[in-house]
Amino acid sequence: MRKIGFFGLLSALLLTLTTSCTSSESKISELTIYSGRTEEYIAPYFAIWQRESGVKLNIRYGDSAELAAQILEEGKNSPADLFISQDAGSLGAVAEQGLLTPLPKDVAEGVPAKYIQGNREWVGLTARVRVFAYAPDRVKVLPTSFTDLSKPIYKDQVAIAPTNASFQAFLTAVISNKGLPFAEDWLRKVKANGAKIYPKNSAIVEAIDKGEVSIGLVNHYYVWEVAEALGRPINVKNGYFKANDLGNLINVSGVGILASSGKKAKAEDFINFLTSERIQSRFVSDIHEYSLLENISIPEDLPPLSDLGAPNIDLEVLKNTKKTQDLLIKVGLL
């Protein structure tokens, strides 16, 4: 009797523990997200998730590079369950230190492999193309390469945003592809050619519209964004360099799950939500970024990604931002 009673009690205890673990996973009521995407653009999708899933999202917004540095400092003690970044470089820096967990193959199934980190530690959400924005009535000779912007024809007319993560990602690609001496020489020439410095991409587009400058390096959606904010057409268009030019870099926003998270299953559900056709279509219509899903339409009035002549750059190299930042400091642009 005692023997039967012991095993009966043990079985009941194991069943209780198993049920408790399953129940605790299914009843997760909160996820903590570090978001390098600004609240203005990403919060509406967070609201949809919270309403439909019943799971509250605790969001910490900030610059992607700064949030990556915060995660590196916190290490395995980070309270974050997910890290959303506006660029691949910041995700790569965190993944390199083993702080992101590989995603199962049934997560983000529709995203092409080239937009997923090799070990599946992060996945792309949207594509963002580097372009030159310009005033069509003032720029009569369009540049064919980013290197042209140091030429006398563009003296005192070029704008850049050295503190911006997207500019730094582009410069990181230049360093990786052309070497540090080449990148330094180009930066010094652009600076000597009278390049104007702005804090962010939208400020560059606004400056072109106001006539302060005539051409600037930005991401593709800022012309649309500024026109939307002003509620009127602006005197700015997107331009593209020749095929395979590094100035046509395609970067991605993306997301990864912290290895230290105890809520991985629910975090995976959230990634599947962000990479679903419904939300990907909203990214296109709401914020004018390219979906990474092949069956989703492209943003209005923009060419397909396949027509842009983007350079063949492994997004993994974009994590090497320290050399880039050191170079910008060296030439006096940071």
Region annotations inferred by a language model:
Residues 131-138, 250-263, 282:
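A bilobed periplasmic-binding-protein/Venus flytrap-type ligand-binding module shared by bacterial periplasmic
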Residues 35-57:
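Short, polar/charged alpha-helical segment
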Residues 89-93, 214-235:
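A ligand-binding cleft/hinge motif common to bilobed small-molecule-binding domains
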Residues 17-20:
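C-terminal motif of bacterial Sec signal peptides marking the signal peptidase cleavage site
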Residues 156-161, 273-297:
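Periplasmic-binding protein-like
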Residues 289-334:
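An extracytoplasmic/periplasmic, membrane-proximal ligand-sensing/linker region
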Residues 36-43, 62-66, 78-213, 246-249:
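Extracytoplasmic ligand-binding site segments that recognize negatively charged/polar headgroups
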Residues 22-24:
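Bacterial signal peptide processing site
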